[in-house]
Amino acid sequence: MTLFRIISLIAFLICFISLAFHFIRLIRLGSPKDYSLKRGNLKSAIAYSFVGAMNPLKKESAYLHLPTYTAGILYHIGTFTSIVIFFLFIFNISLAYTFQWVLICILFVSSVSGLGIFLKRLTQKKLRSLSNPDDYISNILVTAFQLFTLIALISEAFAPFYFICAGLLLLYLPLGKLKHSLYFFAARYHLGFFYGWRGIWPEKSRGYTE
């Protein structure tokens, strides 16, 4: 195992321990305490929060900006793909040539999507006013990670740069907005709990949108 591979693995362990701390903290906090009269089914509402409520047609921020929403979906697919490939690289697992190029194509599309999202945030005044340095740093690191994954799939000569980039991303992940990879699930649970307790979710026939 090369030095750079070991460094990125250490970064992963630090990241994992940090996220485990956040996870334990979430578990200890438990479910929300709601003192209003319970009117709905929590299990159905929480399930709806993760499935039905994620429909872009139910989210104003999504259906009014479908190209950006689509780019975001592609960007996340590229991120998940890159994470899987990271472990394949760590354990030196080879991929079939054809499958390797399928992954390269996926990562190319996702990287372009990430770059497009970054440029939109950079050039649109409204988005700039809502953005902070963490938004830009996170976008740059994830896009760079996808690009270096793509390049490393094409040529192993770039492996050292790939592992450096992966290590930087993993070390930054627990510090900024990227830890939403964990808090997303807690947020959807709490949202389902809140609307489920009040009997608003699952959506019935009132045309309610999130």
Language-model segments: which ranges?
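Terminal transmembrane helical module of multi-pass membrane proteins
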Residues: I140-E210
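N-terminal signal-anchor transmembrane alpha helix
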Residues: M1-P32
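Alpha-helical transmembrane segments and their immediate juxtamembrane interface regions
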Residues: L88-L130, H180-F184
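Membrane-helix boundary/juxtamembrane motif in polytopic membrane proteins
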Residues: T123-A144
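Juxtamembrane "helix exit" motif at the C-terminal ends of alpha-helical transmembrane segments
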Residues: S82-T98, L150-S155
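Membrane interfacial helix-start motif at the N-side
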Residues: V51-Y75
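Membrane-interface amphipathic/juxtamembrane segments adjacent to transmembrane helices
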Residues: F23-E60
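Hydrophobic alpha-helical transmembrane segments of multi-pass integral membrane proteins
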Residues: F12-S18, L66-F87, L107-I117, S138-L150
